[in-house]
Amino acid sequence: MVNIQIRELEEKDLFNGFLESLDSLRKASDLSPKKAKEVFKKIKSDKNYKIYVAVIDSKVVGTTTLFIEQKFIHDGGKVGHIEDVAVRKEYQDKGIGKEVVKALLGYAKKEGCYKTILDCTDDLIQFYEKIGFKKVFSYP
C-alpha cells in the first residue's frame, strides 16, 4: 500500500484535493471558496462532527465524515454515523477508504459511541463488511 497520512480536515485542504475527493460521490469541487470556507467553519465548530482525510504526497485523496448523535436510550449513549466515504478515482482499490473509515471508527469508540452505523448502496455492502460492519436492513 502507498504511504498515506490520516488526519483531521484542515481549511487548507478544501482546495487541495478534499472537494475533488467528494466528487466521486457527488459534484462538490464547484463550490465557491467563500461557501466552502463557511461550511468548513460551521462543521469545525460542531464538536459532534469529525472529518478525516487521507493524504498522499501533501494532497488529499480521500475523506470520511463522522457525526456523533447523543441519545436518551442506552443511558444517554452516543451513536456514530459514518457519511461521505470518498476516494479520488485514481486512488480507489488501494485500501485508502478502509484506512480512513477505520480511523474514524477508532475515534468514535474513543468518544464513547456504543455503535457506529452507515447507509450505503448495495454495491458497497461487501466493502463495509470487510471492515467489520454487518448488514442489518435493506430497502426493498
Spans of features found by a protein language model:
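Short amphipathic alpha-helix that is part of the acyltransferase structural core
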Residues: M1-K35, Y139
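Glycine-rich phosphate/pyrophosphate-binding loop shared by adenosine-nucleotide-utilizing enzymes
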Residues: I4, K59-T63, G80
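A short helix-loop-beta-strand connector motif used in the catalytic cores of GNAT acetyltransferases and
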Residues: K41-V53, H81
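Conserved beta-strand in the GNAT
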Residues: V53, K59-I68, A86
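Conserved catalytic-core motifs of GNAT/GCN5-like acyltransferases
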Residues: I68-K71, I117-D119, D123, E129, ...
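A conserved beta-turn-beta hairpin within the catalytic core of GNAT-like acetyltransferases
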Residues: Q70-I82, Q92
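Conserved acetyl-CoA-binding loop-helix of GNAT-fold acetyltransferases
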Residues: V87, D93-G106
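Conserved GNAT acetyl-CoA-binding A-motif
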Residues: V101, A108-C120
